[in-house]
A protein has these predicted regions:
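Short, cysteine-centered beta-strand-loop-beta hairpins and adjacent loop/turn segments enriched
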Residues: 81, 110-118
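Short beta-strand edge/turn micro-motifs at domain boundaries
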Residues: 118-156
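A solvent-exposed, acidic/Ser-Thr-rich amphipathic alpha-helical stretch
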Residues: 38-100
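Short, low-complexity N-terminal intrinsically disordered segments enriched in polar/charged residues
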Residues: 1-46, 155-164
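Beta-strand residues in well-ordered beta-sheet regions across diverse protein folds
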Residues: 54, 104-105, 136
Length: 164
């Protein structure tokens, strides 16, 4: 989603979408399923530090790089124990706020072969830094939803504030 008729924001949309899905997502999956031999430190190329993570059961800041990599290592170990092979993305959306800030939302169906082992809806707050893009906050929840609109519909506010 970008502002109408703004070619700069359309360029940002293409750039960040390629970075997230072609680079970050593919690398994350290949490290998690061990088709790429790397430790969890790779994530510091994509996730900022500090990183805020929030779900129905956690709400915390990961301040140090080792906290970020430990959090990822724990998640990936749990997935590997379940036989993780890949992640399907049944729905996603990218909202460009300005050339330096976007939100990326997705439903991730984490799988062991054809069996779903985990289904999450995720919201990534992503900002541009001097080198590339960085995720600075992640919110997530378990879901059975098939679409983001089903799970997180847009609500238009009806505010009673002062009107000019």
């Amino acid at each position: 989603m970008v502002a109408a008729n703004d070619p700069g924001l359309k360029e940002t949309l293409g750039e960040v979408t390629r970075w997230f899905f072609d680079d970050y997502f593919n690398r994350w999956v290949s490290v998690a399923n061990r088709t790429r031999e790397e430790g969890p430190e790779f994530i510091l190329d994509y996730w900022g530090c500090p990183l805020h993570v929030c779900s129905p059961t956690t709400n915390r800041w990961l301040i140090k790089p080792e906290e970020v990599t430990e959090w990822l290592a724990g998640m990936q170990a749990r997935l590997r124990e379940a036989g993780y092979t890949h992640t399907a993305v049944p729905d996603s959306r990218v909202t460009v706020f300005h050339p330096g800030g976007v939100a990326i939302e997705a439903i991730w169906s984490r799988r062991a072969g054809e069996t779903e082992v985990e289904r999450l809806a995720l919201h990534f707050q992503v900002v541009r830094n001097q080198d590339s893009w960085r995720v600075v906050a992640i919110q997530f929840t378990d879901t059975s939803a098939k679409s983001l609109d089903e799970l997180w519909p847009v609500h238009r506010g009806q505010h009673r504030g002062h009107t000019p």
